[in-house]
């Protein structure tokens, strides 16, 4: 039994929810998002909340139940508040800057990396060693942050590279003489 799936997703004022068949659409101050619920799950909007139920008690339906409810909750939060991920850059000469509609990263390679910002995502660099990725779609914000981090992930000896804000990097000791 899904503990996550049991709870209905409350829709706050300022957000309009529309359920048409297996498609859930949310519209709020930040924008509009939609999610197609898997066919093993029933979704309905009543009393100002979206509830999700499994069609039957099969393992697959029960697995998708909690996942679908979490996806719908992410739609509500995305269109009302939005999501953001912060990245920190550590290392001598490592920096980030905005270059028009692209993010320019200097990460110790022989060339600078130009990262094209996808539609629906906003990237801000408050400091040369800080990147803030924001948007309404939680999955896309996380994906963009992961792609930027992948260019030079943090290494365990000196901790140089791109990491998420607050991420703990397991440090190793160098070799002994």
Curated annotation (Swiss-Prot):
Molecular functions (GO terms): rRNA binding; structural constituent of ribosome
One GO term describing the cellular component = cytosolic large ribosomal subunit
Q: Name one GO biological process term.
A: cytoplasmic translation
Which keywords belong to this entry? Ribonucleoprotein, Ribosomal protein, RNA-binding, rRNA-binding
Q: Which Pfam families match?
A: Ribosomal_L6
Which SUPFAM superfamilies does the protein's record reference?
Ribosomal protein L6 (SSF56053)
Top-level taxon? Bacteria
Q: Which NCBIfam families match?
A: L6_bact (TIGR03654)
Cross-referenced PANTHER family: 60S/50S RIBOSOMAL PROTEIN L6/L9, LARGE RIBOSOMAL SUBUNIT PROTEIN UL6M
Summary of the function given for this chain in its UniProt record: This protein binds to the 23S rRNA, and is important in its secondary structure. It is located near the subunit interface in the base of the L7/L12 stalk, and near the tRNA binding site of the peptidyltransferase center.
Question: Which named protein is this?
Answer: Large ribosomal subunit protein uL6
